[in-house]
């Protein structure tokens, strides 16, 4: 692949990484601001968002081959990608187990927190550290990851499968199982058809789509050697770079966050109207009307929080 093609891939990576990084910051702000919506499911989403943050940050690091930056970028990229895929699987599992028993995760969240963090953070860190000693990190066409100069040589295929792709393909299979199971359970039970499962199921779906596209490109590379198809590489980079952004968008449009933002904006709007009316009107009728409007909005916020807790059992 020539330098101009690498530049195109690098540009797409930077654009996707920048948008993902900005969206993760917004997600962290909302997590801090809307404390009343926090739940264990919300907490899991924040862990996944942190993986996206690491991936976005690593994709924006300097692209300098044979430098310390290349090793750092490769390490963070491999860690965050593996972690992100595992968290998508955890979201699918959380959705499935919650459809069977709504309060199960909340009741055993201490146990699940240890298991999830060990699986989705500790394991990728150890795996990426092991790969460091194999000396296969390097130029991966526009970014530092697994060196494309050695990736498709026979002696490295086993290492690649064992250290990354085998895990990646296993995650794809598990996510497909969760997706099919969730759809089947939704069809059989009208009780489970609510907004919570409608948006959580998209985490494993998005991950499967992105990983399948990456797999197609890798298999194509195995057959064609180092003559990687540029179009396939562009498609893979687009899906890889924007996967994190899509995950954050799913989170931002989730029932708890989107409704909380709407209610908050209504409160601000009604308070401004209240101040404006009280300053311009001498009578108290409009003031009473505005107080009632504000009281109504506050009730909407309270009712919404209660509805999330009662209907979904998991908050958001």
Where in the sequence are the language-model features?
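Extracellular TM2-ECL1-early TM3 structural module of rhodopsin-like
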Residues: 10, 51-94, 98, 104-105
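Class A (rhodopsin-like) GPCR intracellular loop-transmembrane helix junctions
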Residues: 28, 38-51, 70-77, 104-125, ...
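Class A (rhodopsin-like) GPCR signature focused on the TM5-ICL3 interface and adjacent 7TM helical core
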Residues: 89-90, 96, 162-191, 201-217, ...
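Intracellular signaling interfaces of 7-transmembrane GPCRs
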Residues: 36-40, 97-112, 176-199, 253-283
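Extracellular-loop-to-transmembrane junctions of the mid-late helices
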Residues: 123-184
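Non-transmembrane, juxtamembrane loop and terminal tail segments
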Residues: 259-316
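First transmembrane helix
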Residues: 7-36, 49, 53, 93, ...
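Seventh transmembrane helix
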Residues: 202-203, 208-210, 215-218, 229-279
């Amino acid at each position: 692949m020539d330098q101009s093609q690498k530049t195109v891939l690098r540009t797409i990576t930077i654009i996707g990484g920048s948008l993902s990084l900005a969206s993760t910051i917004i997600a962290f702000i909302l997590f801090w601001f809307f404390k009343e919506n926090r739940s264990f499911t919300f907490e899991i989403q924040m862990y996944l968002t942190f993986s996206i943050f690491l991936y976005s940050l690593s994709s924006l690091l300097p692209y300098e081959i044979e430098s310390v930056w290349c090793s750092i970028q490769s390490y963070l990229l491999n860690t965050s990608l593996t972690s992100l895929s595992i968290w998508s699987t955890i979201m699918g599992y959380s959705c499935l187990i919650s459809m069977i028993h709504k309060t199960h995760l909340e009741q055993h969240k201490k146990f699940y927190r240890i298991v999830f963090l060990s699986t989705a953070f500790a394991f990728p860190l150890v795996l990426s550290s092991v790969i460091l000693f194999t000396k296969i990190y390097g130029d991966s066409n526009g970014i530092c990851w697994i060196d494309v100069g050695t990736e498709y040589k026979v002696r490295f295929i086993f290492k690649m499968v064992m250290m990354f792709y085998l895990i990646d393909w296993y995650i794809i299979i598990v996510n497909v199982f969760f997706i099919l199971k969730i759809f089947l359970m939704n069809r059989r039970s009208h009780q489970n058809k609510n907004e919570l499962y409608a948006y959580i199921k998209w985490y494993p779906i998005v991950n499967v789509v992105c990983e399948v596209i990456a797999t197609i490109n890798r298999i194509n590379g195995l057959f064609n050697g180092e003559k990687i198809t540029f179009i396939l590489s562009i498609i893979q980079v687009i899906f890889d770079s924007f996967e994190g952004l899509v995950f954050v968008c799913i989170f931002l449009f989730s029932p708890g966050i989107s409704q909380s933002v709407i209610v908050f904006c209504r409160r601000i709007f009604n308070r401004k109207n209240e101040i404006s009316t009280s300053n311009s009107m001498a009578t108290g009728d409009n003031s009473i009307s505005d107080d009632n409007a504000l009281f109504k909005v506050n009730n909407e916020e309270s009712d919404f929080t209660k509805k999330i807790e009662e209907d979904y059992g998991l908050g958001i």
